Amino acid sequence: MRPALFLCPVLISVLFLLSSLSLISGCNKALCASDVSKCLLQGLCQCRPQEGNCSCCKECMLCLSSLWEECCDCVGMCNPRSYNDSPATSKSTVEELYRPIPSLFRALTEGDAPINMMVVSFPVAEELSHHENLVSFLETLDSQSQNISLPTSSAQDDALCTVVYFDDCVSIRQCKQYCESMGGSKYRWFHNACCECIGPECLDYGSKTVKCMNCLI
């Protein structure tokens, strides 16, 4: 009985905090609810930095891991942000996938788009014409990979870059897993939690425009 009695106040406080997530400015409830509830249940994010108590800040940051930047608002631990800060949709993280399967990606993106996804194709030349402005990378890119030149042959000029957007918001871990399961070559995860899987014909990192139907903000 004692463990149950001990857990009741914790569960009540967690449920109260989760119910108020959508009221917290900047809190992405769709992305953060699961991880935040896990960390709260472990008692790792329950101190109050705004009241001068940051005794749990380090443990909370480690618990939220790669979602810290996106979810710290949900636990009241983000530094105050300027209204002039760039929106999350303008920031993204990219990574090359270890074992792409081009034939699988093409098969899944030809014809009608799968449920809960949107397939977009555009010229490779258009993909390479934009200067990348990424906030972070999951891997180190050497100087040569950052200075990509436009293709010169007419065949490459006519090539299309095909990408897939998932309709709903997902975590960066889910984004990587989904794109790997589709045989994608790379992925781009926008900091508003929109996921873009990038096909084998793309020479850079696809489009830097958010087009996830239910995850546009």
Swiss-Prot record:
It is found in: Secreted. The keyword Lyase does not apply. Pfam families: Tsg, Tsg_N. The keyword Signal applies. Keywords: Developmental protein, Glycoprotein, Secreted, Signal. GO terms for biological process: blood vessel development; regulation of BMP signaling pathway. Transmembrane segments: none annotated. Residues 1-26 form the signal peptide. GO terms for cellular component: extracellular space. Glycans are attached at N53, N147. InterPro entries: Tsg. Belongs to the twisted gastrulation protein family. Involved in dorsal-ventral patterning. Appears to function predominantly as a ventralizing factor, through its actions as a BMP signaling agonist, acting through both chd-dependent and chd-independent mechanisms. May also antagonize BMP signaling, probably via formation of ternary complexes with chd and BMPs, resulting in dorsalization. PANTHER family: TWISTED GASTRULATION PROTEIN HOMOLOG 1-A-RELATED. This is Twisted gastrulation protein homolog 1-A.
